[in-house]
């Protein structure tokens, strides 16, 4: 029989933190040759969603949570805490492939824009824990990215400020530096920087597969088949005895 698989889901709302403060500098050409100055680095919903399912992010999550022995339990010797000698040691790519295709599922509601992150696993407690930890990690990573980018932007703007004597440009740069400082302050104050949790994952009570109804139906069919086989065998035995 197939082992039961449980599905834990968390409902998320993307948080938009895009920085629109570059407008005053466009007319002065300050942004020329400097990519990414106008973005927050962590608040773009599409980028955050892409990061959530990316290989780099997933590899880091698997390593941080120590999931390699869990994902490949049949190859892991729990007693010696080493990979079995007669089994091929899985690679990071193997782990990403399994996690991305069989464990983690992400869907977006076109009408509402809400995102459902689901984890399917044999242990309901682990499924809910991984789902919630993924959200915590993506929020922390996007928040850190926003802070790093804003700090880089500020350093660049200070260089530009030292190279210009145009009063209007200086004022515009000061405004943008102020906006970048605000971006850092906002990022540091928000735990849910990229995704707001509407409904956190909880350990599911019933497996998503195999379903109980299907098990019952298969059990009935198997019982009928077994009964038919018994009847046929007895009938054949009775015919042989009569001969």
Model-derived regions, located:
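Flexible glycine-/small-residue-rich
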Residues: 12-16, 108-110, 119-121, 199-201
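Short, solvent-exposed secondary-structure boundary/capping segments
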Residues: 21, 116-119, 206-209
């Amino acid at each position: 029989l197939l082992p039961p698989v449980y599905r834990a889901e968390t409902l998320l709302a993307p948080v938009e933190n895009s920085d629109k403060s570059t407008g005053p500098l466009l007319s002065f050409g300050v942004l020329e040759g400097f990519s990414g100055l106008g973005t927050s680095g962590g608040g773009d919903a599409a980028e955050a969603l892409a990061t959530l399912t990316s290989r780099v992010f997933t590899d880091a999550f698997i390593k941080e949570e120590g999931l390699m022995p869990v994902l490949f339990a049949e190859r892991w010797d729990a007693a010696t805490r080493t990979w079995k000698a007669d089994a091929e040691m899985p690679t990071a790519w193997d782990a990403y492939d399994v996690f991305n295709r069989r464990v983690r599922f992400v869907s977006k509601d076109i009408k509402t824009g809400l995102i459902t992150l689901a984890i399917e696993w044999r242990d309901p407690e682990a499924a809910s824990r991984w789902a919630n930890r993924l959200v915590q990690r993506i929020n922390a990573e996007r928040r850190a990215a926003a802070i790093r980018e804003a700090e880089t932007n500020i350093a660049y703007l200070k260089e530009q400020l030292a190279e210009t004597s145009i009063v209007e440009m200086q004022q515009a740069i000061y405004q943008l530096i102020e906006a970048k400082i605000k971006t850092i302050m906002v990022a540091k104050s928000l735990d849910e920087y990229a995704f707001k949790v509407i409904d956190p994952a909880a350990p599911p009570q019933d497996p998503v597969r195999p379903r109980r109804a299907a098990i019952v139906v298969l059990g009935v069919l198997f019982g009928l088949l077994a009964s038919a086989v018994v009847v046929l065998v007895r009938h054949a035995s009775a015919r042989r005895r009569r001969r």
